[in-house]
Amino acid sequence: MANIKLKNYQSYAKINLFLHILNKRDDGYHNLQTWFTFLDLKDHISFRFNNSNKIEITSNIQIASKEDNLIYKAVKEFQEAYNIESIGVDIDIIKNIPMGAGLGGGSSNAATTLIALRDYYLPELSNEQMIPLATKLGADVPIFVYGRSAWAEGIGDVLYSKDFEQQYVVLVKPNIHISTKEFFESENLVKTKNMLPRDLSFDTSVMHNDFENVFFAKYPEFKSQLDEIDQDFRMTGTGSCFYLLSKDLNKLQQLARKVDKSLDKWVVKTLNYAY
């Protein structure tokens, strides 16, 4: 066990460059294909290990109760999976990644927690060895444990390293949301029938987000807002964040100034590693 009692980590956001829903599995999950890359938008998490045998979580925002908190669940799953007799840790998180945005904030925090616990208790474990445990916490948690841009299949847990050429990103987030359950039950969801080859370059003509039609069918006025700025916005995950990619930072900064003041916005850049 390491002697360092306090460790600080950065917990990064992700976007889905595309998201194709293929079919429903016997376990209730859906097989998918997606390409993940990261953003330099991040939360900051500190872990102070102690002998209290208590897990305390604080934040700069209101957070879920322990039973509903992915960070807490990550600690308990790690403790059970690796037979750690007792864990005492004070966890403080400074949230910058918006919640309910499709940016993976909660999943990223859970993955960062697994990595911090690994570093302290079992430093011999590799990130890849923790992916089955990460999958138990949610379909987006494995990519953050994996820690680099990747093509994903299965439920998001079968990962193949695949870099994405760095670009700038403008993110736009409306104060609206659709539940995952509603997405899958919508008559507007058209699933992708054919799998794409993993060596495919980024191609917006064949890569899309199957959930976009559902979102725009429910909120057509938001689509109109986006189209007035630029018609190439794409949704990440199940939203509600939309993003626009460009190698031209000045262009994106100018477009960001056109975004309605009622919408949250960020200008960031993509990253191939979440370290």
From Swiss-Prot:
The keyword Kinase applies. The keyword Isomerase does not apply. Keywords: ATP-binding, Isoprene biosynthesis, Kinase, Nucleotide-binding, Transferase. ATP binds at P98, M99, G100, A101, G102, L103, G104, G105, G106, S107, S108. It holds the Pfam family GHMP_kinases_C. One of its GO terms (molecular function) is ATP binding. The active site is at K14, D140. PANTHER family: 4-DIPHOSPHOCYTIDYL-2-C-METHYL-D-ERYTHRITOL KINASE, CHLOROPLASTIC (PTHR43527:SF2). Belongs to the GHMP kinase family. IspE subfamily. Catalyzes the phosphorylation of the position 2 hydroxy group of 4-diphosphocytidyl-2C-methyl-D-erythritol. NCBIfam families: ispE. This is 4-diphosphocytidyl-2-C-methyl-D-erythritol kinase.
